[in-house]
Amino acid sequence: MSFRIYSLHLSWSRKDKIIVNRDCHQSVINTLILGDIEPAYIYPQIDNKTNILMGIKIEDAIDTIDKNLDAKAILLTYPTYYGKVYDLKTICNYAHSKGMMVIVDEAHGAHLGLSDKLPMTALEQGADIVVQSTHKTLPSFTQSS
């Protein structure tokens, strides 16, 4: 069982709501279904030239939080699967001000803490729970995820 699934099952009850970026990992969708947890989605920006998902806009995250104040948490992917980063700190601060926990899938960002020339990690930006996976961006075996 992935840590994403484990952390969600430990933290919420059936029929609870969480905010999720729509381009999240499939295991998040499976967990929402298995746990009978209601999602409120934030849709990512798409680069019209390349069709690459560019991450979420701050305004969209804040708007989704404001429309779903009954959500227990917000779960985001940072960086995106294409390496795009966004202002996670602002989202973390806003979610916390509304009483929400912030969970971040940082599977493609395990390397971020290795240099101050890289973007800040999710923990440095205020996330409460961070899931990392060294096999995506660092030298480790696939099984080390």
What are these regions (language model features)?
Residues 1-145:
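Conserved PLP-enzyme active-site core in the AAT-like
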